[in-house]
Amino acid sequence: MAFKETTTIPYTPKQVFSGLTNRDFHVYAADAFRADLDEFSVMPHEPTSDDTVSVNIQRTVNGEDFANKLPSAVQRFAKGRVAIEQTEAWSAAADDGARDANATIKVPMAKATATATIKLYPTEDGSGTVVETEGSVKSTIPLMGSKIAQLAEPQVGKFLNGLTKKLEAWLKEH
């Protein structure tokens, strides 16, 4: 099983990418998701359209906030603060502003890793950006890993889609 989410927002790919690589947006999103943004970095610090870009995001969430969505055998692992490590490797922009990224999201507590591709490209009429996210989750916990991955995949897809919706709201304010 894998996840695939597609969202369209009324901003250019350049604006969407600029938001996704902005620390203030990630603070805003972390607050909305009841998480803490522990670390955020973008290399190069002020990317141009010709640059490939690396993004590193470290968040923590309260495990009890989502433990009830996990299988009972795994709920005991979701205690206290749970670290979420996210890295993104973005391509340089195409002439129309489109960009692609390979993203990895790790949750060490669950021995789980999600890999995804993120695509930003202009809508056909140029009125916005289509954000496509597609990927899968693997967990290496013996006997339970496949069940964890199966339950996590839709949640990761929803999280990434929710992040895009938060970006739309944030861009409206900035």
Residue locations for each model-derived region?
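A conserved amphipathic terminal alpha-helix motif
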Residues: 84, 146-174
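Hydrophobic pocket/interface hotspot
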Residues: 16-20, 133, 167
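Helix-adjacent hinge/juxtasegments
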Residues: 63-91
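Beta-strand/loop substructures that line and gate deep hydrophobic ligand-binding cavities in soluble
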Residues: 53-58, 84-153
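Short, solvent-exposed secondary-structure boundary motifs
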Residues: 28-37, 76-81, 106-112
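Hydrophobic ligand-binding cavity/cleft-lining segments
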Residues: 1-69
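Generic marker of residues within folded, mature protein domains
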Residues: 6, 45-47, 78, 108-110, ...
